[in-house]
Amino acid sequence: MYFRSRFGKTVNNAWLPDVFGNSWILPQILKKSGVEYFVSNKMSTWNDTNRFPHNNFIWRGIDGTDVYACVPPTHFITWNMPSQIQENWEAYQDKESGGQTLSMFGYGDGGSCATEEMIELMHRFDKLSVMPKTEQTGGTSFLEKNLKGNENLAVWDGELY
């Protein structure tokens, strides 16, 4: 309701990129709030004990409620360098079932964003045959294209940590 009243947009996705663990009750809360998609990040980048086995998947809550979920394979603060894009693709665990991988870039901590140089790099990647194919898109578009209706997604039934 807040985004609709302030910006004229209905938001159907929740992003908690800088959280180390997410409670098993969250899918139920998200779904009851009109949220279909969930994105978090720390499980794939900061957990040195248990490697989370999926990047694009369905997260099933404690009551059986499902939401689509994305845990990008690399950190949410990158400079969009070719080596970082390559690392993101190589670390992506759902190549066969999850559609594309999400790579976020920019100076995320402190409220900053992508620079002109980072965006220019994105435009140059298509000209490099050794680079994974990239596409610049918005979060909602990415989630809908790669998760919604994807019957090949794994189901994670439990907490995210």
Where is each model-derived feature located?
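Catalytic-domain carbohydrate-binding cleft regions of carbohydrate-active enzymes
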Residues: 1-161
